Each structure stands twice: as C-alpha cells, then as structure tokens.
C-alpha cells in the first residue's frame, strides 16, 4: 500500500492489545488491530491501529469440543472454504476484521472507534524488544523506547512475530542479549554509529568496526561462520549486558507465547541414509523364539524384527498381548495362564460395578450418565464400514460399549474421552476377546492417556516437540508454515491424539501401531512419523503456495492416501539422520532418548487460551427424543457459533 510520501512495507492483522477490563469499563479487554512498518519522509515508522470487526469471512478455529474458547489457531481470511472432509475438532466461524486504511501519522486522530490506542514510533527511537517464551499460544512483543518508556504489548493472535522481526532487521541490528535470549538490543543499521555504540559499550573483545563491516557486507556467512549458532549469535562476543537494558522493561504479560517461537542451534545434518524394511514376522519365526516352558527368548532381537517388518496378521492376536504389556515377555506359559485368570476376575468385578447400577441410580449420577451417553454415541459411529462393527445390532459394537464403560470404572480420574473408541476398535478387532482386549487397551492407554487429560499439557508438549524436530530437519518448511500462520502445527493435532488412526487404511493402522509399540529405535517415533508425512508433502505445500486454509485442507485430504511402509521407511531414515549428527541439540537428543531429560520446569501458571484436547464426557441430562443426524465420526464437527468471547 502506497500513498503520498509513504509506503507500507509490512502489514499484519490479528495483532491485539490486551487491556484491563476492570480499569477500562467502557472498552473491550481485547482490541484488535493491524501492525505496519511504514517508510515515510526518509524515516521508518512502526504503526499500530485498531480495526473494526465486521464481514463474513471464514476462519478455522481449533477448539475443545462443545466449548467456545480460543482462536489461537485461526486461519487467514478467505471468501469461502469447503474442506471436503470431516474436520474433527474444527469450529467454523465467520469473522472478518475490517482494516482502517489510513496514512499513519504521529499525533493524528484515529478514525477507528478505539483509535485512542493507536500509536506510531520511529524505529530509531527503539531501545530494545522483548519477545515471549516459546509455546503453543499467542505471542507478544514488548517494545521499549530510548526514553525508557514502553509501548503496549503487541499480542499476535495469528502469528507473525518472526516476520515482523525479520522486517525490522532490514532497518535495525537486533542483538540478542547474553543475559536474556528473549531480549533484543536495538542498534541502528549505520556502520559508524553502530561501531561507536559497540566500542562505547565494550560489547566486543575484538575490533568492533571489523565485526560490523563484515556483518553488514555478508550477514549470512558472518552470522553462521563467525558465530556458528543462531542461539549463540553475539553471545560469545558480547560482554555482560549494560545496566538498565532490561530494567526498563515492564514485567511480561501473563499470556502464553506464539507456537514454536524458539531459536535453536543451526546444525548441519548429514545425508539421509537409505532404509529398507524387512518382511513381517511369521508364526514360524515367532515359534523359534519360544523356549521349552513357553518363555520367549532373544526378546530384543524379536522386537527389532517387529520394528523392521511388523507382524503377520495371524500372529497379531498373540503378539499384541506382549507388545501392550498384558503378558510379560519373561513369563512362562503357566504364568501367563494364571495371570489371565486373575485379570479375567478383575475385569468382571469392574464390569459389574456399572452393570448393577439401576436406571434410578443412574439418573442421580450425572457423571456416569454422561459417560454412557457419550460412549453410546461414539461407538455407533466408530469404524462402521468395518464388517466387525457393521450394522446397528453387531455384537462388536456391544463389546466396544462394555469395554469403554468398564474402563471408566478402571480409571475414574480419566473416565471416557472422545477418541478412545478409535484406539480400542483395532485392538478388539485383532484380539476378539472382551477381557484380553480390555487389558490390551489399558496398556495402550498407559502410553497415550496424557493425550486425553483435561490439562492438555501433554498435547501441547508433543506439538512443541514435533515443531522442534521439524525445525532441525527442515527449517525452510518451518519458515513457510510460519509465513502462512500454520507454524503451530495445529493440523497435526489429530495425528498425535489418536496415533494416525484416521490417516491410514485400517490394515495399515495395525501395522503402524505394532511398530510404534516396540519402542524402537527410541521414544517418540510417532513424532518422526509426523515429520515423515510432512517431508513427503513439503514440495506440494511450498511450491503450490498454499495458504493456511489450503494447508489444512490438503493435510486432511491425505486421509487414506498414505502408504504406511513408505512413511515408516522415511521416519526411520529421519531418525538415523538425526542420531548421526554429532552436534545435535540437547533438547532434540532428549526427544529421541539419546540424552537424559533435563530437570522438569514448573508448569505455566496461566492456562493456555487454546483448548487442544477433545472434551471430557460432561454431566448431561437424559437424552431427548429428538436427535440430529450424526456424522460418521466419533469426533464430530462443532456447530457454528458466534465468536463471542473467543479471544477473552
């Protein structure tokens, strides 16, 4: 956008001011706006102005089921969006910010209703910029001026902090503070002035003019060859930060930051190795590992074979009991029989607990009634095209229902959460025994139960780890996703929640899960499976120039089109490529199980505004006689709702 004497070089919507509703009773607690970088009259200005919310553009909001919160994964506006699939955990709402396009002038009266909040500052007046900690929610930037005052914190609800910092770096030199990696000291892009500033502050041990001239002439090679790592940029050369650089800053707002805003070490990975998968383990091969007393022998070798080739279908019913921890790898045949008898008694005792509840008791137990209603609804829509569950009177549906209700008795704290029926269905299909399937399901839930906890911390942590792996493996793809407001990887949420159950054909899901259950070649292989899928689709995503809506649509249209063997081969190759890197960052080593985890940090006291997990079964009244048509999913599309309070 250009006008008389000014040119807009950067513009980003969805940038909010978070005001105090108690202090400003006549104003919204969230003020939507647009941030711009404007060249005007031989100066460069940073300008923020509020906008008016109007229109009918479509946004995709990932949210907890039956909730109204959070739009931190909102997409860019487009006139229409027809997903052509069933977007689980997606809310479709209609919001379009209407921008106030006016020439930014200092001291001018704003035309927007909330324009008293508008501001414009010359980049030369900036002293420092503080960014928020990495995470899975909104990011903010706090700008401090040379006079010591601070501008209102800018909250980027649709991403864009990195893009803004990249634009600012064209006009300023942003030096990461050695004391605080989230604090950038601002210096002008003038070689002599910058050298004098460095010399005066004694930031460099060596001649500062030489460093500055090399940086300005060739910033790329100077940054990577002289300073080696992005995270350590200027850290080894900078002396302790000048007093007052951080003291002028206000305390950071109580908001979670933008997804993945983390500068990691720049590592050079070696060539990706070639991987060949083996044939499935057969019954004859399995039998060779069974000793005289029925005890399995050479278990590590057997697990490695399962990892590299999977299991033949006829062997799964027996082998899955070991992979899921129902039977011990070290136990004898007699010990296994005794264990099964004990677990059978335990199962039916728990089943009797809910079976013996009378209708009158259930009416006074809203929690149990809520679980039962949710399970009945989900079971009727789980894998209904599979013959084992086909038809309303199919006994397989009854077994699904009974096992899930019994699990509520087994795990009172967790109960039933939508998505669990998707995890149980393949297990029951393979095991074909109610008791054995229940205990195998419990073993699987031990691995993934954190995905369904109401705190959502496990899902946030997994998405953060996935982003970290992807940034090491393919930083260009990460930058592209960031530029399209998809850097939080919300479109991968369903993959991780139910371990790709909806992405592959049913037989391929069985193969994928048994490989993942081996725990080889290390923990979090499912994250590398996600990286492998994105790696396979990177050219399509990047060369097609997809926006956030198209990325979401394309990812969901991959359902049932992926080859599990190709994905597993690529995931293993990615693992070998990472483990062969001698300078792999420690946090990546932790994810791959190559290094012990660091001391756990205290969880953030502020809950994320983005509900990332499906809804727990709520206490519900008895169902009415009128029922709406149900989609073919145990995780349904939320009805269209007003966006009221989504950003609060």
From Swiss-Prot:
Cell compartment(s), UniProt: Cytoplasmic vesicle, Autophagosome; Cytoplasm; Recycling endosome
Gene3D superfamilies linked to this entry: putative rabgap domain of human tbc1 domain family member 14 like domains, Ypt/Rab-GAP domain of gyp1p, domain 3
Pfam family, one: PH_RBD
Residues recorded as bearing Phosphothreonine in the entry: 606, 615
Main location: cytoplasm
Region of interest: Required for interaction with OPTN: 218-309
Effect listed in the UniProt record for changing residue 381 to A: Strongly decreased inhibition of Rab8-mediated transferrin receptor (TfR) endocytic trafficking; enhanced Rab8 localization on ERC tubules and Rab8 interaction with TfR; impaired inhibitory effect on autophagy
Site feature: Arginine finger: 377
Keywords on record: Autophagy, Cytoplasm, Cytoplasmic vesicle, Endosome, GTPase activation, Phosphoprotein, Protein transport, Transport
InterPro entries, alphabetized: Rab-GAP-TBC_dom, Rab-GAP_TBC_sf, SGSM1/2_RBD
Segments of skewed composition (Pro residues): 597-624
Gene Ontology terms: biological process: autophagy; protein transport; retrograde transport, endosome to Golgi
Any GO CC annotation of this UniProt entry: recycling endosome
Domain Rab-GAP TBC: 310-520
A GO molecular-function annotation: GTPase activator activity
Modified residues (Phosphoserine): 602, 604, 608
Region (Disordered): 240-259, 594-648
UniProt-annotated site: Glutamine finger, residues: 418
Biased amino acid composition, Low complexity: 625-634
Comp. bias regions, Acidic residues: 638-648
Protein function: Probable RAB GTPase-activating protein that inhibits RAB8A/B function. Reduces Rab8 recruitment to tubules emanating from the endocytic recycling compartment (ERC) and inhibits Rab8-mediated endocytic trafficking, such as that of transferrin receptor (TfR). Involved in regulation of autophagy.
Known partners and oligomeric status: Interacts with OPTN; this interaction mediates TBC1D17 transient association with Rab8.
Comment, domains: The arginine and glutamine fingers are critical for the GTPase-activating mechanism, they pull out Rab's 'switch 2' glutamine and insert in Rab's active site.
Protein known as: TBC1 domain family member 17
């Amino acid at each position: 956008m250009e006008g008389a004497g000014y040119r807009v070089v950067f513009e980003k919507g969805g940038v909010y001011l978070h005001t105090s509703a108690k202090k400003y009773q006549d104003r919204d607690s969230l003020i939507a706006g647009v941030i711009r970088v404007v060249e005007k009259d031989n100066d460069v200005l940073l300008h923020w102005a509020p906008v008016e919310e109007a229109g009918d553009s479509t946004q995709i909001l990932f949210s907890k089921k039956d909730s109204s919160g959070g739009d931190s994964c909102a997409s860019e506006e487009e006139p229409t969006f027809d997903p052509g699939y069933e977007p689980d955990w997606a809310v479709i709402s209609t919001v379009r910010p209407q921008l106030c396009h006016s020439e930014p002038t200092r001291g001018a009266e704003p035309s927007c209703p909330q324009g008293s909040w508008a501001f414009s500052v010359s980049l030369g007046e900036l002293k420092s910029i503080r960014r928020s900690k990495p995470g899975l929610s909104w990011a903010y930037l706090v700008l401090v001026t040379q006079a010591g005052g601070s501008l209102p914190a800018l909250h980027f609800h649709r991403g864009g902090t990195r893009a803004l910092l990249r634009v600012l770096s064209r006009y300023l030199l942003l030096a990461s503070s050695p004391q605080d990696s989230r604090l950038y000291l601002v210096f002008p892009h003038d070689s002599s002035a910058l050298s004098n500033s460095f010399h005066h502050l004694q930031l460099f041990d060596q001649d500062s003019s030489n460093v500055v001239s090399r940086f300005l002439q060739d910033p790329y090679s100077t940054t990577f060859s002289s300073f080696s790592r992005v995270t350590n940029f200027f850290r080894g050369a900078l002396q302790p930060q000048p007093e007052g650089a951080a003291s002028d800053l206000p305390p950071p707002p109580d908001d979670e930051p933008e997804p993945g805003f983390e500068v990691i070490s720049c590592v050079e990975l070696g060539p990706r190795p070639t991987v060949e998968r083996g044939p499935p383990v057969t019954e004859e091969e399995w039998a060779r590992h069974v000793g005289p007393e029925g005890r399995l022998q050479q278990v590590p070798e057997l697990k490695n074979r399962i990892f590299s080739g999977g299991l033949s279908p006829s062997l799964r019913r027996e082998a899955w009991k070991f992979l899921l921890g129902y039977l011990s790898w070290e136990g004898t045949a007699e010990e296994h029989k005794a264990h099964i008898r004990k677990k059978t008694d335990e199962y039916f005792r728990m089943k009797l607990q809910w079976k013996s509840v009378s209708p009158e008791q259930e009416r006074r137990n809203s929690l149990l009634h809520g679980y039962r209603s949710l399970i009945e609804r989900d079971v009727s829509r789980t894998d209904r095209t599979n013959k084992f569950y086909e038809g309303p009177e199919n006994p397989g549906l009854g077994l699904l229902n009974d096992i899930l209700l019994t699990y509520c008795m087994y795990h009172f704290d967790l109960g039933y959460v939508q998505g669990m029926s998707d995890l149980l269905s393949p297990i029951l299909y393979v095991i074909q025994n109610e008791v054995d399937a229940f205990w195998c399901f419990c073993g699987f839930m031990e691995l993934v139960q954190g995905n369904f906890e109401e705190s959502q911390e496990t899902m946030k942590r997994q998405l953060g780890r996935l982003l970290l792996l992807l940034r090491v493996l393919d930083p260009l793809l990460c930058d592209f996703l960031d530029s399209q407001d998809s850097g939080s990887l919300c479109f991968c949420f369903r993959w991780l929640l139910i371990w790709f159950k909806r992405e592959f054909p049913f037989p391929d899901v069985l193969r994928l899960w048994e490989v993942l259950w081996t725990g080889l070649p290390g923990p979090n292989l499912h994250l590398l499976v996600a990286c492998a899928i994105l790696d396979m689709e990177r050219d399509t995503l990047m060369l097609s120039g997809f926006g956030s809506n198209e990325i979401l649509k394309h990812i969901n249209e991959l359902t049932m089109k992926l080859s599990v063997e190709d994905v597993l081969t690529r995931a293993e190759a990615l693992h070998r490529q990472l483990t062969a890197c001698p300078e792999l960052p420690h946090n990546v080593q932790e994810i791959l199980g190559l290094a012990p985890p660091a001391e756990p940090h205290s969880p953030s006291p502020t809950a994320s505004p983005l509900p990332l997990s499906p809804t727990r079964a709520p206490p519900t009244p008895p169902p009415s006689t009128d029922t709406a048509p149900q989609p073919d999913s145990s995780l349904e599309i939320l009805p269209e709702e007003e966006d009221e309070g989504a950003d609060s």
